[in-house]
């Protein structure tokens, strides 16, 4: 039997040379099952033989049974040995899989290190180029010095002639108003930011952020999105130290680097440290670019946002007002970026209960948006919604209701044409259902008038919020049927919007998996509820989106 088993094992080993690892594991599992079955069978036979041996007397027949029992025991030992070896093979397979997984992780780390190495190589190449240019400049200056000394010896008699000449060794560079573009901004915002940057460049000198700082910014964002602040912070500090050594502390590039580091601290909720860095960047930009530069306005705005996150609205307000003055001076009083700043200032005033100022700022921003961007621009609806929320805070329900109806009517007209008896916006249907609730229980089917919002893409969040707010206002007035109609529409609109966003994100991931590295961390601070979102210059853009349920509770979103 042992010879036969050895032969079988030899045959199996000969076959293993041609099997894949998965096939080996599968065969091993089958062998384990077979050996377990044989072991159970041998145990049963052994028990039977032992019971037979007890019944027999000591004679030749009992000796034969005892010999069989010994053979069964040897077979059981061999079966247990085979099972042990099979289990060792399975454990080895699991270990190899773990090793392979670890190897994949190490490969990912190697790729990351290669990226960092490439960045360092680029930095080294850039430094070498600068060194070469500096050496050439030194050699040229030495030649010029020798020439001037020779000419001076020839013209010693002429004391009135001076060989010195004035040279401008360095021109002040101007950082962009918007440090790095925000990929999550909507197209309208992107166009406005480009226009703002172009205007600032035309007036102030067309400053370009160095490519190495953009590369560093992307690396820092990637690390911060993964929560690896222990890598991102030292990387920023080292780059800042290098810039200060090469360019000095009072240089626009240093201010840019301070903004990047402030962004990292902001993501860690270290608002005090971030504010200190922005104050330093503000001082540098005021000194190197002038106090009325667009970059100074951007830094003032970002600093105001950080104060807002800490609830220091009184300290934030003068900073925001100064940023507004600069933008009005540089861009003109009717520029869309001025309207953004007005929205931010209105938000800060609203948190302090200065409702008259809030109304003024929102009305002025609304006028700019309607004049410059047109009545169908998303910012128009958003600003109307913000102004309506201000009215609600003061109990001016009629004015708020009028604005909400204007938003819904405009959205309806944009999708379905002018309003008439056969083409009504949803708030009209809601009020008709309220009037007819006693006469007709079921009312009009939602499907007859509820599909208008499906085509609203840009305005869908604002429209949904408006539906909720107007519904809450109806409920406060006792118009429960109308309120339920609008709330049902808001729920369907929100569900459809979430489905569309989900599909879009899935499509983006399928087309470009690396897009998932984008990180835009967003924090919220409850005042009534204030939500700040990331904006240009590594800082904040602030606007407002307000939801009201009749209990004076608000959700405030972005401050630029």
Curated annotation (Swiss-Prot):
Protein name: Kinesin light chain 1
Keywords from the UniProt entry: Calcium, Cell adhesion, Cell projection, Coiled coil, Cytoplasm, Cytoplasmic vesicle, Cytoskeleton, Microtubule, Motor protein, Phosphoprotein, Repeat, TPR repeat
Chief subcellular location: other
InterPro entries: Kinesin_light, Kinesin_light_repeat, TPR-like_helical_dom_sf, TPR_rpt
Function: Kinesin is a microtubule-associated force-producing protein that may play a role in organelle transport. The light chain may function in coupling of cargo to the heavy chain or in the modulation of its ATPase activity.
Modified residues (Phosphotyrosine): 449
Upper lineage: Eukaryota, Metazoa, Chordata, Craniata, Vertebrata
Subunit architecture: Oligomeric complex composed of two heavy chains and two light chains. Interacts with SPAG9. Interacts with ATCAY; may link mitochondria to KLC1 and regulate mitochondria localization into neuron projections. Interacts (via TPR repeats) with TOR1A; the interaction associates TOR1A with the kinesin oligomeric complex. Interacts with BORCS5. Interacts with MAPK8IP3/JIP3 and NTRK2/TRKB; interaction with NTRK2/TRKB is mediated by MAPK8IP3/JIP3. Interacts with CLSTN1; phosphorylation at Ser-460 inhibits interaction with CLSTN1.
Entry's localization field: Cell projection, Growth cone; Cytoplasmic vesicle; Cytoplasm, Cytoskeleton
Gene Ontology biological process terms in this record: cell adhesion; microtubule-based movement
Residue ranges with Basic and acidic residues bias: 155-176
Family under the similarity heading: Belongs to the kinesin light chain family.
GO molecular function: kinesin binding
Coiled coil: 31-99
Region Disordered, residue ranges: 155-203
Residue spans of biased composition, Low complexity class: 192-203
Entries under Pfam families matching the protein: TPR_10, TPR_12
Post-translational events: Phosphorylation at Ser-460 by ERK inhibits interaction with CLSTN1 and localization to cytoplasmic vesicles.
Species for this entry: Pongo abelii (Sumatran orangutan)
